[in-house]
Amino acid sequence: MKLSEVKKYCSIPLEIIKDCEFEYTYLIGKALKKDKVISFVGSPKFVDGLYNYETEGVICTKDVYEVIKDTYTGGIAVAENAKTAFFEIHNYLGTQYEENEETYIDPTANVHPTAIIADKNVHIGKNAEIYAHVVIKEGTKIGDDVIIREGTVIGGPAFYYYGEGDGRRLVTSTGGVVIGNNVELHANCIVEKGVMFENTVIGDNSKLDNCVVVGHDTIIGKNCTVAGNALFAGGVNLADNVFVGVSASVSPNVEVGTGAKISSGAVVTKNVPEGMQVSGNFAVEHKSFIQHIKSI
C-alpha cells in the first residue's frame, strides 16, 4: 500500500511530500525484522536514527522535514503530530493483516472446562496442560508438553498508548505470543502479545513462577528460570539459561546475556553481560553491590 492510500485513516491532516509503498509500521531504534516499513520521527534530535535503518518512508513533523528533505531518499509525509498519524495508520494496518485460522488443540492436550480459549488463531500442542480459568487469546502458539496453571492470561494487548490526556488511545497489538516446548507458567502470569507485527516469545524449557508479567515483544530464551512477581517491560531480551529472582523488574529493551543472574528485588535498567550477576536498585554487578552495602 501507499502513504497516499492510508492518509484517510488519520484524524489529523497528513501532507504527502513524496509517496512510497510499504507493508508494515515499525519503530526506529528497534532491530528491523520486517521489510518495507515506515516509521516516524517527531523531533529533530532523533533524526540520526532514521539513517541507521532501512525504511521505505517516514512520517515526520515540519521541522524534521526541513532537516531531512535534501538527504532522505524515502517517502515523506508531514503531520503536526507525527506520532499520532503513525499509530493511526498502524492501527488501520492491524485490521488488514488479521489472520482467520480455526483454533487447533491437539487431542492429547488436557484443557480445563473453565479455561477460555479464542476460537481463532490459537495453536496448542501435544500433552499441554491448561488449568482452570486460564485465558488464551488470538495469536498464541503453544508448544508441546507445556503447563499453564490457574488464572494465567496469554495474548492480551500490550500496555502501549499514544496521544495525550483524554485523547490517549490504545495501540493495536499486531503481533502474537509464541511459547516453546516444555515451558511452565505458574498461576496468574500475564504474557502480552507483540505490538509491531512481532511476537512475544518464551523459549523451550523455561519456567515462570506465579504472577510474572511478560511485557510485549519480550523474548525469554531457553532454560530460563523466573521467580514470582518478576516483571519484564516491553522489548526485554533474555538469552538462554538466565535466572531472575523474586520481584525483580527489567526495564524496556534491556538485554540480558547468557547465564546471567538477576537478584531478588533488582531493578535492571542497563544491559547485563553474559554470566554476570546484578543486584540492587538500580542494579549493578553483585560484587559491587555487596561492597557498597558493607561500606555503609
Stretches found by the model and what they are:
Residues 1-108, 145, 151-152, 156-170, ...:
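Terminal amphipathic alpha-helical/low-complexity segments used for targeting or macromolecular assembly
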Residues 40, 104-285:
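Structural signal for interior beta-strand "rungs" in well-ordered beta-sheet cores
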